[in-house]
């Protein structure tokens, strides 16, 4: 399912990404968190900003505008009229509006008709768990759209545990149940599923969280092989915004480079995340001062400062093949 060409250390990529996500003037979420890493890794990125806010909504105040489905359609029509709507990848993240999400699906379907090898990477942002209890932070009417329209056209999805449970209607209490949920998600459409975080216990203790991945690869003879992995990721004692957007963008890049090796793609993605977050928390604590809690502004991802780690991450998190 992978498209284009990619060369480590030089050479232009032929791959072009249409990224439909939020935008902030200050900070790194949505397209701001995805565009720079993808460009550093050799991709052309065309960004549609689903919202334009002054900053992310974790601050005390924010101002801005929201793009509606008609405006999204108009932007896409402009690309189409000029015959510049050829893409290898589509990347989407947080969306609050049902009609906007349906328009995204229409665009993806049309692009896939033009290029059957196009890969759609979807982070189905709907909610999360706090202290074991899950809650949605988007309108509930988005769930059936994700289930019935979005996931079936996606090739790679990156839900957290709660979102995977929402999509399948099945709770996860064990690794075996998580693997079964990923199989259910495969059956809905995507060949690659990564559950980016879970509340499953880690053998390494409470300071680690478990992430799981599953990738189905089809051989020319029609046979299907499945690679499943588990990763134990050291927790960072801070609340960051934009990490899911960064994760999805880097997973797009590294699955492109390693199309049939989810283990390596996830190791590089998670290791790069580790370096970015470590640098961010160190800088935030230094700016806040000893014993003081860093502010949202101080916890903005140190993206530019992490360019080398994004480009060529030292692998510090190993994945286990299950």
From Swiss-Prot:
Which InterPro entries would you find in this protein's record? PM/HMP-P_kinase-1 (IPR013749), PyrdxlKinase (IPR004625), Ribokinase-like (IPR029056)
> What is known about regulation of its activity?
Activity is increased in the presence of K(+)or Na(+).
Please state the protein's primary subcellular location. cytoplasm
Catalysis performed (reactions) = pyridoxal + ATP = pyridoxal 5'-phosphate + ADP + H(+); pyridoxamine + ATP = pyridoxamine 5'-phosphate + ADP + H(+); pyridoxine + ATP = pyridoxine 5'-phosphate + ADP + H(+)
Q: Where is the active site?
A: 245
Cofactors needed by this protein, per the record, are: Zn(2+); Mg(2+)
Q: Where does Mg(2+) bind?
A: 128
Q: Which residues carry this modification: N-acetylmethionine?
A: 1
Which keywords label this protein? Acetylation, ATP-binding, Cytoplasm, Kinase, Magnesium, Metal-binding, Nucleotide-binding, Phosphoprotein, Sodium, Transferase, Zinc
Binding-site residues for pyridoxal, renumbered to this chain: 22, 57
Which SUPFAM superfamilies has this protein been placed in?
Answer: Ribokinase-like
Q: Which family does it belong to?
A: Belongs to the pyridoxine kinase family.
What biological function has been recorded for the protein in this entry? Catalyzes the phosphorylation of the dietary vitamin B6 vitamers pyridoxal (PL), pyridoxine (PN) and pyridoxamine (PM) to form pyridoxal 5'-phosphate (PLP), pyridoxine 5'-phosphate (PNP) and pyridoxamine 5'-phosphate (PMP), respectively. PLP is the active form of vitamin B6, and acts as a cofactor for over 140 different enzymatic reactions.
Supply the NCBIfam families for this chain.
pyridox_kin (TIGR00687)
Q: What is this protein called?
A: Pyridoxal kinase
Q: Which organism is it from?
A: Sus scrofa
Its taxonomic placement starts with: Eukaryota, Metazoa, Chordata, Craniata, Vertebrata
This chain is encoded by the gene named PDXK
